[in-house]
């Protein structure tokens, strides 16, 4: 008998949702950074064994939006509640429950689907603090289970996976066993470039960046994959920061992104990057759609 199911990973920004998904999948399919709102699109991670398939849906961190892009991200996250049988509500062990958590809990109660509370980053707190956190969240909602983990170190992650597989129902294998995500390579390439921008830049730059892969094709003579990508920003000052002195920052971003892209593709890559200014793109629906943030996603 084959069992399968869809599982959403929900929570505030920076609680470790993408770190968890990457650990489960054994490779990077969701980009990570210490900047809030790193994940902007829903991303499937397809975990398949001989007898089970769990389709995880990593979601943007739920926050109070200030732009049309923020609206898209929050609606994209909540839309998964219509698509899954189980929700992993992830919270950090080293932060107390806040208004953002309470807002999510109210939506989860209304959805009327099983919710597992996943308390991440247990490596950062004393066990007594963890117990207080568990009691506090349990006082707000009747969770199906509570599972403390460390997504970064992998602590207790196998326990959570076993809990999910034990509760799967008989179902189809929705995706081939060798498919690990629903997004095309172009999307993953654009995300890997954006991840390096987030890593190397500060202040207002990360939130204002989008990456568009203009072309991606193999050069038969060199046997390299040629990729042309444009980094979009909202202001000239941001463009200057990303390019850097004599182009040094852009070269660093390209070099580090190329390493990850080559690892993913299993091919040598020639990466060309440009930086363009598109003023206030985060509040323009046409620009959002052009840059891959389309309302059709939810």
From Swiss-Prot:
Stretches the record annotates as G3: 58-61
Listed GO MF terms: GTP binding; GTPase activity; ribosomal small subunit binding; small ribosomal subunit rRNA binding
PROSITE patterns: G_ERA (PS51713), KH_TYPE_2 (PS50823)
Subcellular location: Cytoplasm; Cell membrane
Positions annotated to bind GTP: 11-18, 58-62, 120-123
Region annotation (G5) ranges: 149-151
Bilayer topology term: Peripheral membrane protein
Domain KH type-2 stretches: 201-279
Gene3D superfamilies: 3.30.300.20, P-loop containing nucleotide triphosphate hydrolases
Region feature (G1): 11-18
Name the record gives this protein: GTPase Era
Species in which this protein is naturally found: Streptococcus pyogenes serotype M2 (strain MGAS10270)
């Amino acid at each position: 008998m084959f069992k399968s199911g869809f599982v959403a990973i929900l929570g505030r920004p920076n609680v470790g949702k993408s770190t968890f998904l990457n650990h489960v999948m054994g490779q990077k399919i969701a980009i990570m950074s210490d900047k809030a709102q790193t994940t902007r699109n829903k991303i499937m991670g397809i975990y398949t064994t001989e007898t089970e398939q769990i389709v995880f849906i990593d979601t943007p961190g739920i926050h109070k939006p200030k732009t049309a892009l923020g609206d898209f991200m929050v609606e994209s996250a909540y839309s998964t509640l219509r698509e899954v049988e189980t929700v992993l509500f992830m919270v950090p062990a080293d932060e107390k429950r806040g208004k953002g958590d309470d807002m999510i809990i109210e939506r989860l109660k209304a959805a009327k689907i099983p919710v597992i509370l996943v308390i991440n980053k247990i490596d950062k707190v004393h066990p007594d603090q963890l117990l207080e956190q568990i009691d506090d969240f349990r006082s707000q909602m009747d969770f199906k289970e509570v599972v403390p983990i460390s997504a970064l170190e992998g602590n207790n992650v196998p326990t959570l996976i076993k809990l999910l597989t034990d509760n799967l129902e008989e179902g189809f294998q929705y995706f081939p066993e060798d498919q690990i995500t629903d997004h095309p390579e172009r999307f993953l390439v654009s995300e890997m470039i954006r991840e390096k921008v987030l890593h190397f830049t500060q202040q207002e730059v990360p939130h204002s960046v989008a990456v568009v892969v203009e072309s991606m094709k193999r050069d038969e003579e060199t046997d390299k994959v040629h990729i042309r990508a444009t980094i979009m920003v909202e202001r000239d000052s941001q463009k200057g920061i990303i390019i850097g002195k004599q182009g040094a920052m852009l070269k660093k971003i390209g070099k580090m992104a190329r390493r990850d892209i080559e690892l993913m593709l299993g091919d040598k890559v020639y990466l060309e990057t440009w930086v363009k200014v598109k003023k206030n793109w985060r509040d323009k629906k046409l620009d959002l759609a052009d840059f891959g943030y389309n309302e059709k996603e939810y």
